[in-house]
Amino acid sequence: MRPKLRIEDLHFWYGENHALQGISMDVQPNRVTALIGPSGCGKSTLLRCLNRMNELIQGTTLEGTILADGQDIYADDTDPVMVRRRIGMVFQKPNPFPKSIYKNVAWGAEINGYTGDLDALVERSLRQAALWDEVKDQLHSSALDLSGGQQQRLCIARTLAVQPDVVLMDEPASALDPIATSKIEETITELKKDYTIVIVTHNMQQASRISDETAFLYMGRLIEMSPTDQLFTRPEKDRTEAYVTGRFG
């Protein structure tokens, strides 16, 4: 099976800071891949390389190759806007637009020239994000009136509405309470039927619950990547074992 994403000898710098050093890994389709590691290890930097978000930051340099379905996303003739449409991003803090719930979901599709049934697209996206039943009678109310957990699921629906292949999530539940976090985790598990998901999390219990593969990063390097059950119970590297057992973090 061809990987959905293939990362080959990836190096990334913020100015002189060599933040990612020789990362090579595959992300399989319709799986949840978790990126774990201590703060500053490069998890979020790697995630943002996967849809060219980091190149919006001045003074950065990238070397290496990232392939999506076999195509180089950093090739000179590749439009970064199209990359970000195919590989969507959900951020750590919910960031709904100051618009109605409906407009939040429809906006991306509208600016991308969607010509299908917008009402159906909004409903489908909200259902996929497990939010439809909670908001179907208030679609034209402000998204800012929703709870934090609902706002984050709305942001997931907004990402899905542009019909990506891959969804990147940067600690999507870190600002939420346990009940809202559980709902997000259930949503992620359902979404992998239709999407490939890469998630950054500091919560190792969360990684073990929802991911199929886990990659452990430390000081900008990929230390180990394996099926999640194996990485948490039978890690191959001493440093991985020390991290997952809480001896350092």
From Swiss-Prot:
Pfam families: ABC_tran
Keywords, comma-separated and alphabetical: ATP-binding, Cell inner membrane, Cell membrane, Membrane, Nucleotide-binding, Phosphate transport, Translocase, Transport
Membrane topology summary: Peripheral membrane protein
Subcellular location: Cell inner membrane
Location (main, coarse): membrane
Catalytic activity as recorded in UniProt: phosphate(out) + ATP + H2O = ADP + 2 phosphate(in) + H(+)
Binding site for ATP: 37-44
EC number: 7.3.2.1
Family as reported in the entry's similarity comment: Belongs to the ABC transporter superfamily. Phosphate importer (TC 3.A.1.7) family.
NCBIfam families for this protein: 3a0107s01c2
Subunit structure, interactors included: The complex is composed of two ATP-binding proteins (PstB), two transmembrane proteins (PstC and PstA) and a solute-binding protein (PstS).
Protein name per UniProt: Phosphate import ATP-binding protein PstB
Species in which this protein is naturally found: Salinibacter ruber (strain DSM 13855 / M31)
